[in-house]
């Protein structure tokens, strides 16, 4: 670890795929409480800008921090990627503090599209922020556009809170001149912020929250000490369904269960977690997980690898102390309990955006202050991989699981999805057969539309047959290379329970690079949040799908795009009753 005079921390991480990865602690949307919710997220969208033909890049805003990364591709170099990312924050050697109203307006529209996307595909319910005075969704809404000047002032104010002590930088290689470049830019920031934010309100403990969730989860408040953080790292590397959350200076260990009986035993104090010393901790974490640790605990004064001897040699005492603290919090009701609930009728409170939720007090009724049993935890395997075809009945459940667990990755191709994970076969089956997970997986049917129409365009099966088997979709014909013939009509209007645009496009020079560039152009115009595309077996032919509230504008953009020599697009209007009759009148494609 290299520490600049203003406390910027720089790490060389030659294992990561990114060229540069930067995080800013104490800079997430928890800072929006008592201001305009969404300022942090809007700032993230305003800052990131790059040439998608030369770079891959992204950014994210969480409760307590913001992070950005950039990777060079094609003819660009690592040095180019580093300078591109730094340019998001500095202009002519000075920290950016000017944002045009037109750009703010476009990005607010993009935020509304992101809200729509996330609520169609996920359940975006941030319980901790809500209990601390924020909302269940804190990413920004379209009504921010009514206060553009105030929003701009808040954005400038937020930039002035950045200080060296908040900055963490991972670089793949620290090339010649790179360290000096960092000193001239992020190293020029004050060690402490020019504007000190107000303290984050303390979340309320001793609550039961009934909300959509794939698991029965208990958030246990523990002290944010070094030993507890090392204990969390030990548990995270060893077991599934254990993680942590922070808000302000508070730390919660999150423990999830698939069995309601075990969950209730844990809550009543009659059972403790069965934690055993079963392996050596290697700290082989992803760069995302490492960055999150440094940002959530900015007071860490050493490289995490400096603690690898301590976490292994002292694991017994660390885990005993952590177990005792967990149990004390259960007895004292320093917990937030999440109980899976999918009823739209049950509600006893709402946030300012009128999202309904049930919040109850966690009482001491039935507490047993002497545990007499232990609960086994799901152990991690080194690695596992499965391939699921689009016709497999478990397709959507596996997609749901990957969306709910950050350590599961999936890649999509023309035939199916390849999933990498570290679960045993028995544990995967137990999760997917659990009552709460099944309800959660089916509570957001919008994600299925992407695969319904992919099946329609790629297989040649009728929409009636596909809809009749929507729980499993239909297996594609892959024995022969399909030749897709486009019909005369380029637009088919349907009514579904989501608003989206999808279809197939073909072009002589069409490739993934041009589609990514197209996606970023649509994002800059505020018309979409993201766009998925799948390369079909027919030459230069892709299937596109994007959720959007601006369907006509997106259709017009795609319809007039000169890269497409042929196209067939479906435009969906959101409604209570599905109507796909337009797809039955003509033969849209012939396979």
Swiss-Prot record:
GO terms (BP aspect): proteolysis; viral life cycle
Cofactor(s) this protein requires: Zn(2+)
Organism domain of life: Viruses
Keyword Zinc on entry: yes
Functional description taken from the UniProt entry: Probably involved in maturation of some viral proteins by processing them preferentially at Ala-Gly-|-Ser/Thr/Lys motifs. Does not seem to be responsible for the cleavage of major core proteins.
Annotated family: Belongs to the peptidase M44 family.
Listed name of the protein: Metalloendopeptidase OPG085
Residues reported to bind Zn(2+): 41, 45
Enzyme class of the recorded protein, top EC level: hydrolase
EC numbers, comma separated: 3.4.24.-
Protein's organism: Vaccinia virus (strain Ankara) (VACV)
UniProtKB keywords: Hydrolase, Late protein, Metal-binding, Metalloprotease, Protease, Virion, Zinc
Cofactor: how and how many bound: Binds 1 zinc ion.
Active site as annotated: 44
GO cellular component, one term: virion component
One MF term in the entry's GO annotations: zinc ion binding
The keyword Metal-binding appears for this protein: yes
